[in-house]
């Protein structure tokens, strides 16, 4: 199935373009999720194609999507990684970038704490935390513009459940990789804020959508987007991180 996915992605015209046919662009989403998909399959099946894909995705993120001039990882770039200076091209999705950071840190751990990957994952985490953490109200906001222009998406300053779960995981991996107490402090910061705002204290489960100030935007516990994935994954990955909290020599 994984090989079929790669074949579909590599076959021109087989899948509808994510962006307009007249706009040649690369997307961060498929690039980063293939790291995690290959990693999960590799835990059960050994196949060189999995390591190859992980290497290719990490190289693409470094080459195309990381933009030091903005200290940001962009969601959409030109074919050579150039900035597409439009509303969509300038978008930073902090939660998505933080998720990428822990995918890379997890791979660094798999490689006995590969220093280059640790450095890369930490850099993405720190960039994305700076863009995403709301210094006034707390929590990770949805979207930013790399030039600090107004963001087009109407939910840009809301707090969705899943960016918080990714930040909880990423900060634990960062602490595990470095033993730097600041990442443990960041973990406590995001964890405390998340558990103070998202769980329904009367009936259980989490709300999915908060206003910027942390009040509930709508009370649904699940919909076509919010399913039983990000929260249990956060709990499982955090538990496994806590089983071992010191980096390899």
Placement of each model-derived feature along the sequence:
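Long, well-ordered core segments of solenoidal/helical folds
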Residues: 1-14, 54-72, 121-136, 186-203
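Carbohydrate-binding/catalytic loop surfaces
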Residues: 13-33, 71-93, 137-162, 205-225
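Well-ordered alpha-helical segments within folded domains of soluble proteins
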Residues: 26-42, 91-109, 157-176, 225-239
């Amino acid at each position: 199935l994984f090989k079929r996915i790669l074949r579909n992605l590599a076959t021109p015209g087989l899948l509808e373009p994510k962006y307009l046919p007249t706009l040649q662009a690369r997307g961060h989403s498929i690039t980063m999720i293939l790291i995690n998909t290959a990693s999960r399959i590799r835990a059960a099946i050994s196949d060189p194609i999995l390591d190859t894909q992980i290497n290719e995705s990490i190289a693409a993120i470094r080459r195309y999507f990381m933009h030091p001039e903005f200290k940001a990882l962009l969601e959409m770039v030109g074919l050579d990684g150039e900035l597409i200076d439009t509303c969509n091209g300038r978008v930073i999705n902090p939660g998505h970038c933080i998720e990428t950071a822990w995918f890379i840190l997890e791979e660094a751990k798999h490689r006995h704490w590969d220093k280059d990957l640790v450095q890369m994952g930490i850099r993405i985490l720190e960039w994305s935390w700076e863009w995403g953490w709301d210094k006034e109200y707390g929590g990770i906001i949805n979207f930013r513009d790399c030039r600090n222009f107004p963001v087009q998406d109407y939910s840009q300053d809301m707090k969705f459940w899943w960016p918080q779960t990714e930040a909880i995981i990423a900060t634990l991996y960062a602490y595990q990789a470095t033993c730097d107490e600041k990442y443990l402090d960041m973990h406590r910061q995001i964890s405390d804020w998340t558990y103070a705002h998202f769980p329904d204290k009367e009936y259980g489960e989490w709300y999915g959508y908060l206003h910027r100030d942390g009040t509930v935007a709508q009370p649904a516990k699940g919909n076509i987007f919010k399913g039983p994935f990000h929260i249990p994954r956060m709990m499982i990955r955090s538990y496994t991180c806590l089983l071992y909290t010191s980096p390899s020599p």
